[in-house]
Amino acid sequence: RLLASGAVVPRVPWYRGENPFPLLAATLSPDQQRQWGEDLAWLARLDEAIGAADGPTRAELLNRTVRLAQRVFPDGELGERPSGFLYEDREAARSWTDPLDDAPFAQDVQVLGELADPWVARSHIYDLMVTRFVSLFGSGGVCKDPLAFFMTLAHAPDGDEEMLRAAGLDYAAGPDTERAALPGGLSGSPRHLGAFLQPVAPSARTYAAGGGLTVVNAFTNANGSLQARFHRLLGSSFRERLATRIRTAWGTERVLEIQASTECNTGQAVSCGLLPPLGLPGEPGAPDMVPLSSLRLVHDPATSTLFLADDAGPVGLAYLGLTPQYLLGGYLSWLVLLSDPWSRLPPFADHWTSRRRDLNGPLPDEVMHSERAVAGRLVTRRESWTFPAAQIAPLMDRDLTTTLLHMDDLRKQWGIPVEVFVHQHMPSQGATFDQHKPRYVDLSSPVSLLALRGWIDPDAAHISFVEALPARGEALGLTQDGEPTVAEYLVGLQWPKDLGGMA
């Protein structure tokens, strides 16, 4: 209402693709200029400098950016001082064959699709949204102000019991073929699931012949968002192919992109611009933008779904942003739910989140051993051993020889391999907790154990050792120079929007 009345007027500080640092510098007072002006001027030239630099120079430029970031974020502001690790996504000159051309790998993907199928189901929170729409506008009703409806949902109190119950049902849900068969609406995406798959074998020939293993590292979505983050890097041909695939999957030529570039972080803008934008309050305009205010929200009683439409018919919605859907706030979270109404939590990946869902409570003060879980050649869980931290800390002696002997005894007692990934479990996991990434450790290497000793947090409650797959000699990727490196494939599974389709 404030926007519509003109009482609040959005002011876009800079436009997408524009260098923000000169504009930021122009807003500084003389005192601020003396303090920050030199840094902002250097940042303004950074993009051009990186583009012209060779590898070592580019790394040094990024390291200088790291040091600047560490000065900007003091201790305590975001939980801990940033680690200073920056990376850049780069295209590779080396060409790769499509792994799905190999029949054994394609069979792995088929098996995974069959396992995950009943776990990719319409969410209960989407059902609640439909129920509340019908209570306001009736079965088959039409809402002429979709933004107002979504904002009404967003302003529900924190203690909304129905919302909490629906969210809990989604988190705890198991396989449900009936809910997997429910439609997601004309505006929504097809059912989808992305999987990070890692090949493991002593040689590429062995793997192509059906030997070795395929590890399911993690799940994500498969609506095109992970590919969209690279569309500016890979060019217009890639962008057009991806946009065409999205329209085909949605089953309509008109798919609008929810471009939440102002939400949470400035990195959101990286993936924007693949499809015509849905016009939202505070977002930059575009010539092909379709304002949300020009659309109607409609209930389809035959499918118990909602969709957006105008006089020309229904329109699809796609959210391709970097910020995960569950972290979006306000009305955006409900608008994105309309575009992606699926719950996707199959327990067939070796990711931190998937492992945590297996626990009914806190980790016990005893050793937990979990066997490797397999389905054919697929590894859906690596073998792991979780110890109370108090049992591991005394083994990490200042004398490296003593540490090596202690670790050798531990390995023999529990059958732990030499190469492992190590997780540390902290007693308190607040909003800024980011210790999900494991550390590779060679338990027979003094240097590796010394690094582990310095890495483990004194406050850690438990330490997990997870078998390293792939281990040395089992990585099937190749660098541009032909050196072995780790390879990981992102495979997208989509089920057609018509009922009964296979992935």
Where are these regions (language model features)?
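C-terminal structured domains
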Residues: A218-G473, L478-Q480, A487-G501
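Type-3 copper protein
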Residues: L3-Q268, F433-P438, S445, A451-A503
